[in-house]
Amino acid sequence: ITAFLCPSDSSSNGELCAYAGGNWARGNYGMNVSPCHHGIQDNLSDGGFGAINSSIRIRDFRDGTSNTVAINELRAGLNKNDLRGCWAMPGLGSGTAAMYNDASRPNSRQPYSDDMENCAVSGSLGTPPMGCYDSQSTGQMTARSQHPGGTQFLMADASTRYVTESIDFKGAQNNCGPVEQRGIWQKIHTRNSGEVVGEF
């Protein structure tokens, strides 16, 4: 479906994902689960846009819908064995996005930043700029694009924004750390922490 694809991503070329039986379509957008935990959980307290088998109401966005990311841009996998962008899969980066530890700022080039199943088979193990770590869980993924210098995303109020790779990120804070120690990147990915974001 064209609306789910970014024309700037050279990997969004119609090649289907071969993971878990194959023939899965790819996309370039994923729901913001939370920047505060590893993997997909049904715990809504970490403040993303959604979680497994859960629903969120507008009143739950204490930080404001204009200050909370709903959808992050993702890059499709680099080959048919790379599950990133494969939206039917439950793993982060295939229909959702979470930023945690070394899966940090947009377009992170850390060699093991994306934790995902099938990483070694995909050929991206420890290989920047889309390096990954072979994880037996749903892992972690960061926002990615082929736009120069940053990524696009959709806020909870339906506005779109562009954020640069240099956005403030406190990568050392597991589980986001105390509110006062969070970077802007974490703040805009939580909805109910009472954070003041300011301009970004």
Question: Which residue ranges define each predicted feature?
Answer:
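Short cysteine/histidine-rich zinc-coordinating motifs and their immediately flanking basic loops
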Residues: 16-24
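Hydrophobic alpha-helical interface faces used for helix-helix packing
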Residues: 23, 27-200
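Extended catalytic-interface subdomain
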Residues: 1-11, 16
